[in-house]
Amino acid sequence: MSEIDVVAPNLKRRLSGVTATVVRLIPVQARMIGIVTTGPGLPADLPHIPLRRAATLPRDRWRVWHARRNTEMALGLILRRILRRKYKLLFTSAAQRQHTGFTRWLIRQQDALIATSPQAASYLERPATVILHGVDLTVFHPAADRAALRATLGFAPEDIVIGCFGRVRAQKGVDLLVQAALRLFPSRPRARLILSGRITADNQAFADDLQRQIDAAGL
């Protein structure tokens, strides 16, 4: 393993958007800088060190602790202030919402901030560098036979298909998209909407209510 300059923690076992970002981004970054992950639930082919090693790296120089969650920001503070590790603290935020008081306090302790959109940056209350999410075109690209793919999904070639991908929860505004479809689709018979994403237990009632609205409209 090359010299470690950046440690990117992932302190959540369950797959989430943050975890997916780490999994996709680290291999790209590892071709340019000395970066490793730490924490559970990550693929074995990622450059990785145990948490105990992240907490005992030598103090010979500064390294970057790149957090994406509150728990990871908090651990970075512990490593630097209590264990006296030489970490510069970096936080990347994709959230487009008001942060809690605790999160705002954690953000104030960071040395630098990244936001994945101008909208996310507007909620940070501190200057942030905006770096938009990229797309790996070797993985995500149009199908070779789009008509066959549409048929597999039950869509006709002339259908106008709108896709929404990601966890189904109120915070993401999925309900606004459904409400717009309920108003517009009756007069646009070729329009189709597909939602694809995980529904966690705490959002099941929200998803069920959306399904009831769709069923009631006969769509």
Regions found by a protein language model. Give the residues of each.
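N-terminal subdomain of nucleotide-sugar transferases
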Residues: 1-44, 55-60
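A short, active-site helix/loop in glycosyltransferases that binds the activated sugar's phosphate group
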Residues: 108-142
